Structure formats: structure tokens, C-alpha cells
Amino acid sequence: MGGIFRVYEEVSVNGQKGGSMSEKRQGEKNFTKKKSFPKSAAIAIFWGLGLLLAAVLILHHNPLADQVTERMKKVSGCVLSAFTCTIFTIYYDRIVTIPIELFQSRGLIWKLAKNDFKKRYAGSYLGIVWALAQPVVTVLMYWIVFDKVFQARVEFVAADGVAPPYVLYLMAGLVPWFYFSEAISQGTMALVEYSYLVKKVVFNISILPIIKVIAATFIHIFFVGILLVVAVCYGYTPTVYTVQILYYSICLVFFVLALSYLTSALVVFIRDLQQVISIALQIGMWATPIMWNIKMLPSDNMKTLFKLNPLVYIVNGYRSAIFEEEWFWEHFYSSTYFWIFTISMFCIGTLVFRRLRSHFADVL
């Protein structure tokens, strides 16, 4: 606790170390007025992008796909795009506040994220080794059980006639999943863990969830490196497609951050949400094609239903980047759906966060 507090004192956002709640709220209002982009121009640009996306959706045509499913995807995409643009227009002032705060506090965010990462393993003999141990043991356990004991790899991953080494297929799914699980768990509890900053200091509490997300990213970078090494060992040398790992990692960070603003705000008032998320993660691991191939599902409707899970896009993307050699724009509808969903969740999350933030200190 002291480490974070000292870092904040060194790089204070407002140059103050204390203040009443009324001063805090006034400071937040003044903070968001600085260097603000013209509202009408921002809304016009957002709607322009939304209309452009809708036009691309309507004009896109895949003659090999089921046309009924294609029309459903087009309609759903246009509706989601219109919904997101409408929410952005109505609640513009509330939605843009947090992105502005994050940008203006980027130096403080980086310092606090590094300090949070170091603090997590301070005092233990093995330190950061513990952060690596559980994921490695989990990968080895699943690999031994499914690949060596049951030898079920063909059924799980060779639905399209191509069977990469199962350990590589498994790691490409588990690496993004481990990051998502760790980041959403830590991000959800950010306000609760740093309650002393919420209550006692003039502090832009909107930076707390992203601090946790960035701290979890350090370990993720290490595991991405291990994943690439394993791929090379099996003969999958890096290609131009491998660069997409950066794109899919950015997708994952934005998606987790969008969810974290919503869950971190709600868990302050509903502590049971932490347990709900824990159970949801257990279910989500099996609902996401990490150990199995979504192509093995018997019907297109079931495949479409599972693809509503945004993590399917990311997990499949990691595999496309490493051994399937596919560009993300080849999955047009999946990419469009993912970003519309993520932006919508970010808008909703920031709205809820802004609506409840004045009550955080009282509850905590």
C-alpha cells in the first residue's frame, strides 16, 4: 500500500495531496475540460465511422456462405453500430471523460502499473516465478491428459483435416485465456484493493482498472514469447502473419479494459460479483474453443452462437497468426462484431463507472 501511495505522491495528477470530496469532484470536472476535442466534431466523426461500417457491411458479399445467415449478420451489425453511435451521442460528455483522464495521466499510470506488478510478488522467495508456475503447470496438465493419456487431439483440433501439434494448439488458446482471466479478476477488484486512494486522496480513480490490466500484460508478454519459441521448436517459424499477435493482443487489452470498468464499479456495491466472475471464468474456459476446434460443431447455427463470445475471435486469431496463416480481415464479420461489441461495452462500462464513482468512497 505504501509503495503505491509514495509513487502517487511523486507524480500527482493535480499536484495536490488531499482535499474534500467536493473539491475532488470539482477537480474532476475541471480536469476533463482541458484540451477537449470539439463535441460536435467528435460526434460527427463517430457517426461517420458508424455509417461507413454499416455501408461496408451491406456491400460485403460472400457467395459461398448461407445467404440467410449473411443477412442476419448484416442486420445485427447495422443495429449494433446504430446503437453504439446513439449511446455515444446521448452520453458523449460522460463517455469521453475517462479516455481523456487516461491520456492525461499516462505517466502516472505507467509508474503505478510497474509498482503494482512488483508489489504483487514482494516478500516471497521465488517472486515472479509464482506468476509463471500456475499457467505452465496448467498447460502441462492439459497436454498430458488430452494428448498423451486420451490421445484425443485429432478429434479436438483436426476437424478441418489439419492437425498442428496439440501442445502448440493448446498453448495458442491458453495464453490469451490466462491473460484475460488474470486481467479481469485483478481489474474487477482494483477499486476495492486501492480503496485508500479512493477515500483519502484527490485521485483520478478512473486510472485504477487500467493499472491492473497493464500489470497483467507484463506476464502476458513473457508467455507470448514462450509461445513463439514453442512454435519454432515445432517448425512454425515466424512469418508476416505472426505480426498479427500484436493486433490480437491489443484487441484483448481493449476488451478486458471495457469489461473492467463495468465490473470494478459494480463489485464495490455487489461483492458477490467477484464469485460470479470466478464461476463464469470456469464456464468460459470450456465455452471458448481452447482445447477443441469450433469447426467440429455440427451446425452453422451452433458455430454462430459460440462466436458471439468475443474471446473466440481472439483465441482463433492467435492461432491464425502462428500456424494457420490467415489475416484478420479475412474474418470480416467476426472482426466487425468484436470491435462493435467492445466499443459498446466500453461505452456502457464508462457510463456506469461515472454514474457510481461519487458513491465509491462512501461504500468503501
Please describe what each predicted stretch is:
Residues 5-11, 19-364:
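Hydrophobic transmembrane alpha-helices and immediately adjacent juxtamembrane helices
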